[in-house]
């Protein structure tokens, strides 16, 4: 997805299981080893029909994909990466392995991180202007 919202999707011929992809308005979704060919369409609809911050919309897309069948096998991991205007991720949340729902774990982490995200950007760009978090060493 470029800065104008244009999308492009490519996967090689060796994709495993059910593979499909779809482009939406300022979004794209695709996957392999899917339980159903409609999973990416559900993800695009989840993204496009959700208002709010990009993280909220991406999590809604992941949840919509899961509700549409998700992966053919058990889901153990998920991640959320948001890149903004700087040379580092605005948000990078991961769940590398769980027996529970990793999308729920990402959503819970986003709920905690989202209100603080801009403060971390401020801390990186101009630490003296950043709010104090009240942790040892940050009085």
Write out the residue ranges for each language-model feature:
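N-terminal nucleophile
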Residues: 1-139
């Amino acid at each position: 997805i470029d800065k104008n919202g244009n999308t492009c999707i490519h996967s090689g011929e060796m994709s495993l299981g059910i593979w499909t992809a779809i482009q939406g308005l300022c979004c794209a979704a695709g996957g392999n080893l899917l339980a159903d060919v409609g999973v990416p369409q559900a993800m695009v609809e989840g993204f496009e029909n959700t208002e709010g911050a990009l993280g909220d919309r991406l999590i809604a897309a992941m949840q919509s994909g899961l509700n549409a069948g998700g992966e053919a096998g058990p889901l153990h991991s998920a991640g959320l990466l948001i890149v903004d205007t700087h040379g580092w991720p605005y948000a990078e949340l991961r769940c590398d392995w769980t027996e529970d729902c990793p999308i729920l774990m990402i959503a819970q982490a986003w709920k905690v991180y989202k209100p603080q995200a801009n403060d971390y950007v401020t801390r990186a760009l101009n630490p003296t202007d950043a709010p104090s978090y009240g942790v040892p060493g940050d009085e």
